[in-house]
Amino acid sequence: MEPQTTAKVVLTTTKGPIEAELFAKEVPLACTRFLQLCKSGYYDSKPFYRVLPGELIQCGQQEAGNNTNSYPKLKDEPHTRIKLKRGYLAMASEYTENNRRVPNSATTEFFIALKEIPFSGTVIGKITGDTIYNAQDIARGELTEDGYPMYVQTVQNVEIVLGGGLVQETQKAGADAGADAESRENKSGSRDRPKKPKRKLQVNHDDDDDEEPVFTKKSVSKLVEDKFKKDNTNVAKKPKVEASAEQPEPAAVQATTTHHVQDAEDMTTEVDTVVSERLEKFRNMSRTKPDTKPKSMLISQEDRIRRRLGLGPDEDIPSDASDPSSDEDDDFDIFKHKFICPEDDKAEDSLITLGA
């Protein structure tokens, strides 16, 4: 967005007035020079000596007899938000034989653009209202073979409508801008200077009794332990407060806590004892090999014969009786023999049939 103008002048020409507003705040150096020239009457009776129809008209050429050193060259002040459009004023620069603009060469001349022109110099203002047509009338004049206007149009006088009191302010702003430019140049020049060697500052710590702290990396558990130690130290440093009647006695609390701790330890001991006993029993069981037959089944050969013949424990065994476990008497049927219960002497003989 284009900035606002802060000054205004009216150029009275032979074709009519041309009202121009200036960007005095954005381009202080060029606007200061232009306002000074207008106030001193420099542009009075100055011709528009250069006319390019449909392109531009230029004014403010210095006469050959004037001292050109009284108007030093201005530094270019291009602005990113101010472009050279139709009806805008700009400070004229010098050009080489190859038609190349010489930077930082503007002095007193200005020109009015009649169309948008690519320009990298300093644009100082713009024409307002319908007075742009008076500038176009100046460009319509006839030209000679050399390209100069046949009927020269001139600036009769210049009136400062707005910003007459800003000449001093613009001078101050221009001086500040020049100082800033010089300081920037000095800074840029100072960058090229060789750097001074750096000197290390040595400090003698012999008189200091305190040693520099040594920082070590600690684990989380170590940090927590240090924190609890610090908290316990702070608690020990706190003043003792008398216990009220409502609060329990510290001794009773300590005794209760000790009792619970003792119970827990006893319970742990009992559990360990039971577990140890069961483990020992299990180990003994695994070490002992059980008999292939129960003790009740291990009987002698005579007892087997007595049971086979149905004899009591005190009765004699017949000489022709054989062992029931041998293979000599396979036809003997144990279920057909009579068994007598020795416990019941008075009872009659009863026939017990096995497997019934």
Swiss-Prot record:
Its taxonomic path starts at:
Eukaryota, Fungi, Dikarya, Ascomycota, Saccharomycotina
A single GO molecular function, which one?
Answer: peptidyl-prolyl cis-trans isomerase activity
Q: What is the designated name of this protein?
A: Peptidyl-prolyl isomerase CWC27
Q: Which gene encodes it?
A: CWC27
InterPro entries linked to this entry:
Cyclophilin-like_dom_sf, Cyclophilin-type_PPIase_dom, Cyclophilin_A-like
Look up and give the organism this protein is from.
Answer: Yarrowia lipolytica (strain CLIB 122 / E 150) (Yeast)
Where is composition skewed (Basic and acidic residues) in this entry?
181-192, 279-294
Task: Decide whether keyword Cytoplasm is in the record.
Answer: yes
Indicate where this protein resides in the cell: Cytoplasm; Nucleus
Highest taxon of the lineage: Eukaryota
What the entry lists under SUPFAM superfamilies is as follows: Cyclophilin-like
